[in-house]
Amino acid sequence: MSNPQFRAGFVAIVGRPNVGKSTLTNALIGTKISIVSRKAQTTRHRIHGVLTREHEQFVFVDTPGFQTRHGGAMNRMMNRVVTQALADVDVVVHVVEAGKWSEGDAKLLPLLPKSRRSILVVSKIDALKNRDELFPFVSKLMALHAYDAVVPVSATKGQQLDQLLDEIAAGLPQGDPMFEEDTLTDRPVRFIAAELVREKIFRLVGDELPYGCTVVIEQWEETERGVRIAACVVVERESHRPILLGAGGMHMKRIATEARQDIAKLLDMPVHLEIYIKVRKGWSDREGALRDLGYE
């Protein structure tokens, strides 16, 4: 029987690259479903994370950073993910970094739907050197858009997250839960495993490696001893191969070790992970190649 007091709905978390959207999503859900690195545009897909409380179910849509400077098929695809998410949700959370406002932030404002509850989240408040700067910064942004609420947060320290959830809950429609109570994401574990490998790549060699790098799980075999995984790292140029390998293969060994540890923690079972590299020239600027590699 339906509970007339229960609320459930979709929540888009949007913002320019590197403002902390994925870190916030992971903190709200309480587990890692979106990968994080210093490299902008780490998130490329629309990822649903689910949090269920006593009276609400939040389905968070972690989106790529909205790209305003660079073209190309991948960036067009990521921007489509953002605009589609904004059209399909009940609440919009616009994340901006404390004390920093740029052209990329401003270009998102016209896309925020006026018919949805919109919440301004000022992230990374723990990094502000002078807290007195926060109020004038927020006042400036509130004058630019009619946000329904503003919540300063530190996702890494867990500050103000409960207040943010309460503000989001106020915009969710009444309805039954869409997922089972223990569901954390609608993405399959193979997808999360591939993303964890990509995260380790970006964290270790992201400054040297261009964006033309993705990961595809090509083998997944569960046995009594655990799971055997073969992951293919697809790059665009032969010159990217030595960057990934490192001297004596040390980069790849570290990537594989750290990814294996995270995947084993995710699955709660032993993992044997093999990673190899494949060159596919120009894949990130071809719509067909993007679809072949699992991009929306």
Curated annotation (Swiss-Prot):
Residues 123-126 are annotated as: G4. It is a peripheral membrane protein. GTP binds at residues 15-22, 62-66, 123-126. The keyword NAD does not apply. Residues 41-45 are annotated as: G2. PROSITE patterns: G_ERA. This is GTPase Era. Coiled coil: none annotated. Signal peptide: none annotated. Monomer. Belongs to the TRAFAC class TrmE-Era-EngA-EngB-Septin-like GTPase superfamily. Era GTPase family. Residues 62-65 are annotated as: G3. It is found in: Cytoplasm; Cell inner membrane. Residues 153-155 are annotated as: G5. It comes from the Bacteria. InterPro entries: G_ERA_dom (IPR030388), GTP-bd (IPR006073), GTPase_Era-like (IPR005662), KH_dom-like_a/b (IPR015946), KH_dom_type_2 (IPR004044), KH_sf_prok-type (IPR009019), P-loop_NTPase (IPR027417), Small_GTP-bd (IPR005225). GO terms for cellular component: cytosol; plasma membrane. One of its GO terms (molecular function) is small ribosomal subunit rRNA binding. The gene is era. Keywords: Cell inner membrane, Cell membrane, Cytoplasm, GTP-binding, Membrane, Nucleotide-binding, Ribosome biogenesis, RNA-binding, rRNA-binding.
